[in-house]
Curated annotation (Swiss-Prot):
Alphabetically ordered keywords of this record: Electron transport, Heme, Iron, Membrane, Metal-binding, Photosynthesis, Photosystem II, Signal, Thylakoid, Transport
Subunit (UniProt): PSII is composed of 1 copy each of membrane proteins PsbA, PsbB, PsbC, PsbD, PsbE, PsbF, PsbH, PsbI, PsbJ, PsbK, PsbL, PsbM, PsbT, PsbX, PsbY, PsbZ, Psb30/Ycf12, peripheral proteins PsbO, CyanoQ (PsbQ), PsbU, PsbV and a large number of cofactors. It forms dimeric complexes.
Cellular component aspect of the GO annotation: photosystem II; plasma membrane-derived thylakoid membrane
Origin superkingdom: Bacteria
Lineage: Bacteria, Bacillati, Cyanobacteriota, Cyanophyceae, Oscillatoriophycideae
Residues holding heme c: 62, 65-66, 117
Sequence similarity: Belongs to the cytochrome c family. PsbV subfamily.
Cofactor note: Binds 1 heme c group covalently per subunit.
GO MF, any single term: heme binding
Membrane topology according to the record: Peripheral membrane protein
Subcellular location, record wording: Cellular thylakoid membrane
Protein name per UniProt: Photosystem II extrinsic protein V
Annotated Pfam families: Cytochrom_C550
Biological process, per Gene Ontology: photosynthesis, light reaction; respiratory electron transport chain
Native organism: Rippkaea orientalis (strain PCC 8801 / RF-1)
Length: 160
């Protein structure tokens, strides 16, 4: 009898592991999802679906070098909004980041990095982005611009 009760309790605990409620996506307000579209100051509102897709693609393909918005190869330049704004040309808007993912350049804009940084222009060198669509690039750029609003340590801090 004791074994039967223990088996019944174990069975209930086992099945409770699978009876979870579906997780709802984090609902972000419109202000959080509003990012710069271009250098003229136009803005766009990124959808939650775009942010989710951008995050998935970023984690899948970019975090090897850009974990939490930092840059593994150069700790002085991150994906924080201040660093993106300080680049030449500024990369603190969606269209500039999409352009960078197509034609990467150095932080000062002087050198072409198409053979050094992952991009969609050279799938022969960087197959990671081979299947990225224009929408995927837009989603990743949107995520990179929304991420600092969600994580105070995105791009690094004086402590990390």
């Amino acid at each position: 009898m004791k074994r039967f009760i223990l088996l019944a309790i174990a069975t209930v605990f086992f099945f409770c592991q699978f009876q979870t409620n579906p997780v709802n996506a984090l609902e972000l307000d419109e202000a959080t999802r509003t990012v710069a579209l271009d250098e003229t100051g136009k803005t766009t509102i990124v959808t939650s679906k775009q942010i989710t897709n951008g995050q998935r693609l970023f984690v899948q393909e970019c975090t090897q070098c850009h974990l939490q918005g930092k840059t593994k190869t150069n700790n002085n330049v991150s994906l924080g909004l201040d660093d993106l704004a300080g680049a030449e040309p500024p990369r603190n808007n969606v269209l500039a980041l999409v352009d960078y993912l197509k034609h990467p350049t150095s932080y000062d804009g002087e050198d072409n990095y198409e053979e050094l940084h992952v991009n969609v222009t050279r799938p022969d060198l960087f197959p990671e982005l081979r299947n990225f669509t224009e929408d995927d690039l837009y989603d990743v750029a949107g995520y990179v611009l929304v991420a600092p609003k969600l994580d105070a340590y995105w791009g690094g801090s004086i402590y990390f």
